[in-house]
Amino acid sequence: MPLCTLCPRNCRIDRSKTTGACSVKGLKTAKASLHFGEEPCISGTDGRGAGTIFFSGCSLKCIFCQNMPISRDGYGKEITPERLGEIMLELQEKGAHNIDLVTPTHYADIIADVLTSIKPRLHIPVVYNCGGYEKVETLKMLDGLIDIYLPDFKYASPDLAREYSSAPDYPSVAVKAIAEMYRQTGKVQVFENGMMKKGVLVRHLVLPGCRHDSMKVLDILKATVPVSGIRISLMRQYTPCGKALEIKNLSRKLTTFEYNSVTDYAAQLGFDGYTQEKESATFEYTPEWDFEGI
């Protein structure tokens, strides 16, 4: 394995020998199953679900992460690229609407090779479900292989990105990444049943005390890609955990006023997409890391 430069950390570590900035070495996953917690156009509402593969490791260091065991601690099971391809085809056989690759950035080169080899047998869309901290050069490896990009756009403020994710360059990196994603997929396309066929769906988790930054995120997004060409998902599922409990703003849940301020602003800007109910702010969106399907 060459020195790793897949993510913006550019750690240049030989991940065949030691862990990189992403906290993992080889290809590791923690679960592969039909998943029903994504947006309706991804998971569906007919009981089929998204064919979700949760990868271990992450290039971001978000202090409020609810998936810490796999994102930071590297919990997971090592598999071969060949097995990854088999898992994708098995999920298709189970009736998945799509293949949903969660936190795939640090395996992008492997994923590109796997998708190239199985694409003739894979007849459902492939979703690249990521944190938005992506290098354009890495995304270009996937051009023509990914049907749906599902990135986060977490922050507009470099200061917030530094404090909460140890990534002050996050805003500038995410903007370029989302522009590249849109270049690859073009305007959102849907199947007759409303499921997403192609395009970009941008997620934003509204954080307590950060509603003005959330509005700035929407401003930047509108200036980056056509509002009518994408979908957005404004999430209110923030639940304090881990080190976030030690930070004043992050030690509480989001208020209805804060969330509605952001959703109202998104509507003013003309965005189309998804919102969440207050009851979503629980840990029930966090799966059990039981190696199912691996």
Residue ranges and their predicted role:
Residues 114-125, 176-184, 256-264:
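Alpha-helix-loop-beta-strand connector modules within alpha/beta enzyme cores
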Residues 51, 99, 126-128, 149-151, ...:
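Hydrophobic faces of well-ordered beta-strands that scaffold small-molecule active sites
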Residues 143-158, 230-238:
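Non-cysteine beta-strand/loop elements that form the S-adenosyl-L-methionine
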Residues 71, 108, 132-135, 153-171, ...:
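Conserved radical SAM core fold
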Residues 23-144, 148, 157-159:
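Conserved Radical SAM active-site core
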Residues 79, 106, 165-173, 209, ...:
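Alpha-helix N-cap and loop-to-helix initiation/capping positions
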Residues 1-19, 186-294:
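Auxiliary Fe-S-binding modules of radical SAM enzymes
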Residues 162-193:
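Anionic-ligand binding region
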